[in-house]
Amino acid sequence: MFPLNFHYEDVSRQDPLLNRITPTLWKFLGSCEIRVVPNGPYNFIIKNGKLAMEIPRGQKFIQTQRGSTGKSFRSNPFLGSNKDKGYVSDLARQSTLRGHGMSNFSVRISTVMSLLDFPVEIRKNSIQFSMETEFCEFAPQLQDHFEIFEHIRGFNVTIVTSANTQDETLPLWSGFLQKDEGETQ
């Protein structure tokens, strides 16, 4: 069974977020990008390279700037190099998923959101939630590289949509608020 069949048929009452094109091809409506930020101790630096979900997908990191210093990060975020010390914790950097990587991550999120107790907040044009590392059990591309994540508490995820208001966002993404047994948050 395709992973989204459960979400589409049993959980989200055919939520308008998902548009079934063929029995195995889905389109996520209104999503522009997914931003993922590891959540860990303030001074913790991941030394093993890229965020694991990006390893098989070749996604790019967004380089960020800090306040009035105007200094940008030029090294690989998550590599804990000395030239990054003193700016902002490496965990403050976000990873942005688009295209195929975003689609795969969306499939995993849609499949497990109804099973796990992640609080979800729908804002103007975004959906925000935090996931604990137990999410890795549902994402093989993460589980294969779990050593990177063994010291973090989870991920902060923001799904940016093309909506202009919260009223436009809510109907499409309401399935994220619905739990396995029909309960909503």
Swiss-Prot record:
Main location: mitochondrion
Mitochondrion as UniProt keyword: yes
Keyword Mitochondrion carried by entry: yes
Signal sequence residues: none
Superkingdom: Eukaryota
Keywords on record: Mitochondrion, Ribonucleoprotein, Ribosomal protein
Protein name, UniProt field: Large ribosomal subunit protein uL5m
